[in-house]
């Protein structure tokens, strides 16, 4: 827009970007918004759950095509043949155990009934957190899970 100052907030994950948008105040000045948005983003950890498209060795893991993988804050967390086992291991991480808010975005390849099971898993394992399940509709990633 002509006459408007545009600032890019360098988020690294979709949940970080969402957190920045939630605190933006259209009535505040640019500096105030940048500070608030950057702070909001810094408090977000992200897990991304997907599958291996090919065999590979990465980060000490021998990954086979079709294995389920979890990335936590951009680093390979674990791989498992079973998605359920991977999620059970992921939910035990301090990132989620110490979270106040957890948002679970499920992808286009996840049935709502399966997403509900994942919600129950996180709700049982993280009783102190407020947990929200959302249809993200994202391709490739079964889940994107944010913890704040």
PLM regions: where:
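N-terminal loops that bind phosphate or other acidic moieties
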Residues: 1-148
